[in-house]
């Protein structure tokens, strides 16, 4: 996908294919109105007011056959998402009818849009910057209301504003350095001394480091916590999964080794998306299929952000329990003592004190798991502060880290007594790195790659 501006008219189906109440076929470009009018029987779309919805029928211009009864939205540039003329044909939902209309539009001169091309045009035409474009996809992919809140704030420009303001301050500092170098005789320009440059770079660094501190929380809310439920066979792992999901996804029996594979499901725990991985019970076994499940369980444990270790309170600790306690001790771990509704036989003195006693059967203390997750990952500070700007995108986080490193290089140079003009390079690099976040200084290949990840019609 080229990032040069293209002014042809593109089209795509913007709703998921399949049965539904409505389907939407979108057009964007200079000829959007003319192409839509060529297949529309109703008002003249080239003469209606902007941002109106118009009733009519889509017809095949070659045969005069009615394809569907539709409502057509007309939105004129520049007050559209792409800042081009946009037409949206609202059809009855269904694969056949939306595809038929799409093919008609292509035959009339529209081009099939590439993935993300509508949003790409919004970016190229200055409607959104790169962070806002990425926020569109984050909204689509958001698994919880908290993740959506962060994405909507980013789409609204909160991160863009912070980055742009910082870039402007850095640019002002660079300009002051340049004036001091090129016109040292100017008395009305403040001298960029070593002390003043140190003060400014430390200010920039502090701002970016504060932003980085939001990354852990933001990334969790955007991508979720990979959560492995581990334990020896028949301690209640699958029952816990079903309890958290509030539906029966895993097979629950009294037969050890019933779960032969890894089961993955997403669940919303107080705004945090947890990718729950119900693993096969980890034990020594001669069953080849179960052995494969056990190996996958160990791999899931190693890769997990959070480990829920389930023990059976109604039985004494086994060697398998002790092995799992050792195996998971370096993880973000919550130990769950299940089956506390039965007579307790487990040796509590051999276990860490911060375990949670639960009964999956009676739902006892399941809510405490949610509280412990908040304590482990959010320091009990709550999930989303209303006015805060969060980093949640791995690309943004990586670039902010690089920008901080460049500022550290400036401060290191100042400490070594390097001349101010020699430190311009690192300060300029900081300015360029921040520009990659918003797209002002992003390479063409990056922009192409980012938009290729979008869905068709967006």
UniProtKB/Swiss-Prot annotation:
The gene is mnmE. GTP binds at residues 234-239, 253-259, 278-281. Binds 1 potassium ion per subunit. Residues 224-378 form the TrmE-type G domain. Its cofactor is K(+). It is an enzyme of class 3 (hydrolase). It comes from Streptococcus pyogenes serotype M4 (strain MGAS10750). One of its GO terms (molecular function) is GTP binding. It is found in: Cytoplasm. K(+) binds at residues 234, 253, 255, 258. Its EC number is 3.6.-.-. It holds the Pfam family MnmE_helical. GO terms for biological process: tRNA methylation; tRNA wobble uridine modification. GO terms for cellular component: cytosol. Keywords: Cytoplasm, GTP-binding, Hydrolase, Magnesium, Metal-binding, Nucleotide-binding, Potassium, tRNA processing. This is tRNA modification GTPase MnmE. InterPro entries: G_TrmE (IPR031168), GTP-bd (IPR006073), GTP-bd_TrmE_N (IPR018948), GTPase_MnmE (IPR004520), MnmE_dom2 (IPR027368), MnmE_helical (IPR025867), P-loop_NTPase (IPR027417), Small_GTP-bd (IPR005225). HAMAP family: GTPase_MnmE. Belongs to the TRAFAC class TrmE-Era-EngA-EngB-Septin-like GTPase superfamily. TrmE GTPase family.
């Amino acid at each position: 996908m080229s990032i040069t501006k293209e002014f042809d008219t593109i089209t795509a189906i913007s709703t998921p294919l399949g049965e539904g109440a409505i389907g939407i076929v979108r057009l964007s470009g200079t000829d959007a109105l003319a192409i839509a009018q060529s297949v529309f029987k109703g008002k003249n779309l080239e003469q209606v007011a902007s941002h109106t919805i118009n009733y009519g029928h889509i017809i095949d211009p070659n045969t005069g056959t009615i394809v569907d009864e539709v409502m057509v939205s007309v939105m004129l540039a520049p007050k559209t998402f792409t800042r081009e003329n946009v037409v949206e044909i609202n059809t009855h939902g269904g694969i056949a009818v939306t595809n038929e209309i799409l093919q008609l539009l292509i035959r009339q001169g529209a081009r099939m849009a590439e993935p993300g091309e509508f949003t790409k045009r919004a970016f190229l035409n200055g409607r959104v910057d790169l962070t806002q474009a990425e926020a569109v996809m984050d909204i689509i992919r958001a698994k919880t209301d908290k993740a959506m809140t962060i994405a909507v704030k980013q789409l609204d420009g909160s991160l863009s504003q912070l980055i742009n303001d910082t870039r402007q301050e850095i640019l002002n500092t660079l300009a002051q350095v340049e004036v001091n170098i090129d016109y040292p005789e100017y008395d009305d320009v403040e001298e960029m001394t070593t002390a003043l440059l140190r003060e400014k770079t430390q200010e920039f660094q502090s701002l970016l480091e504060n932003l980085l501190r939001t990354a852990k929380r933001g990334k969790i809310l955007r991508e979720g916590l990979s959560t492995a439920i581990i334990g020896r066979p028949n301690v209640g792992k699958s029952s816990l999964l079903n309890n958290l999901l509030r539906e029966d996804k895993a097979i629950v029996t009294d037969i050890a080794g019933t779960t032969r594979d890894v089961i993955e499901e997403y669940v919303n725990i107080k705004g945090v998306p947890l990718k729950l991985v119900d693993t096969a019970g980890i034990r020594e076994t001669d069953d080849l299929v179960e052995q494969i499940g056990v190996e996958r369980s160990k791999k899931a444990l190693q890769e997990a952000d959070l480990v829920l270790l389930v023990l059976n309170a109604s039985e004494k600790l086994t060697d398998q329990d002790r092995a799992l306690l050792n195996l998971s001790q370096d993880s973000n771990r919550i130990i769950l003592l299940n089956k506390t509704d039965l007579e307790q036989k487990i040796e509590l003195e051999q276990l860490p004190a911060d375990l949670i006693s639960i009964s999956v059967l009676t739902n006892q203390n399941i809510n405490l798991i949610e509280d412990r997750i908040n304590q482990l990952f959010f320091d009990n500070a709550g999930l989303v502060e209303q006015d805060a700007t969060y980093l949640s995108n791995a690309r943004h986080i990586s670039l902010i880290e690089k920008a901080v490193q460049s500022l550290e290089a400036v401060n290191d140079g100042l400490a070594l007594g390097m001349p101010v003009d020699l430190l311009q390079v690192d300060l300029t690099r900081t300015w360029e790195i921040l520009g990659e976040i918003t797209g002002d200084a992003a390479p063409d290949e990056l922009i192409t790659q980012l938009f290729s990840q979008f869905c068709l019609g967006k």
